[in-house]
Amino acid sequence: MQIWPHKHIHSLANFSIKDYESVFELANRFDALKNSGTKKIPALQGTLVTSLFFEPSTRTKNSFELAAKRLSADVQTFAPSSSSLTKGETIIDTAITYSAMGADTLVIRHSSSYITFEIAEKLDAINSKTSVLNAGDGLHSHPSQGLLDIYTLIKFFSKNTLNPGVLNSKKILIIGDVNHSRVARSNLWALSAFGADIILCGPETLIPDEFTNFLKTPAPNQIEDPVKSRGCITISRSLEESIKIADAIIVLRLQKERMMENLLSSIDSYSLDYGLTSEKLSLNNKEIPILHPGPINRDIEISSKVVDQYPNCLINNQVSNGIPIRMALLYLLQKNNQ
């Protein structure tokens, strides 16, 4: 395995192919250990992972904490409502405080885009050894979700082996609220890195035309594009036509808590046009994989019948795969600091 080059993980925009492969190979090894009956290993014994979640979370928060515990790390959790934030302390000072307590990795979720960059810069300025791992920041990025989504697709298409080349030229359809989705942005970087052709489908209020240029926009602190050959992004307004040619589908929920104005005429009309149903899926002559990062709004962006009965609905696979992916990220960051 290559030497891990990152002290902090903010975004997949700065990931090279070797970075992806390092994460996937290590996650696969951790997954194999679990499947053999070994649920806990001493890889990070004596280290401290601190979970700083300023937004609600079920999957990501618990997945990171379980990942840390399976590596035998100590886990410190944070509750905003009972912290000094209520007394006026800043988020950055909170992070510095936990670093001073000995946190080796801060896993951070917050509503402000790019906040993890600010925190990491402050920590580095005081020569802290603490790593920062972005667990979702505003509209910007959700790298661990992007990684687990691509890992799930690779395992599906390569029949549970690990061949990232299987995504090359695959048509991956992403449906819904791309504009307000940090998951979608991470998926765009990761899918394109492996040569997938991406179709974004939804109304213009949720997928503006400029998303076709997304991959041409430099990421913060990105000196050069680490991946030279990418797939392409196209935009469709017809879900039915998009489903006909898709090799896989990623469904996004409506991020109503991030919408600053009413962008839809009604939820019912959105569901009618862009909700994924068994009837619409029947337009594709293959049983293609369906992903959703959760939480699900049943019978709005995806029908309960698809979630519960469609044979290649991989939502639970995503949740399961999130644990070894996050184990890999925590392990790589800590080994970088040793």
Curated annotation (Swiss-Prot):
It comes from Prochlorococcus marinus (strain MIT 9301). The gene is pyrB. One of its GO terms (biological process) is 'de novo' pyrimidine nucleobase biosynthetic process. SUPFAM superfamilies: Aspartate/ornithine carbamoyltransferase. One of its GO terms (molecular function) is aspartate carbamoyltransferase activity. Heterododecamer (2C3:3R2) of six catalytic PyrB chains organized as two trimers (C3), and six regulatory PyrI chains organized as three dimers (R2). This is Aspartate carbamoyltransferase catalytic subunit. It catalyses: carbamoyl phosphate + L-aspartate = N-carbamoyl-L-aspartate + phosphate + H(+). NCBIfam families: asp_carb_tr, PRK00856.1.
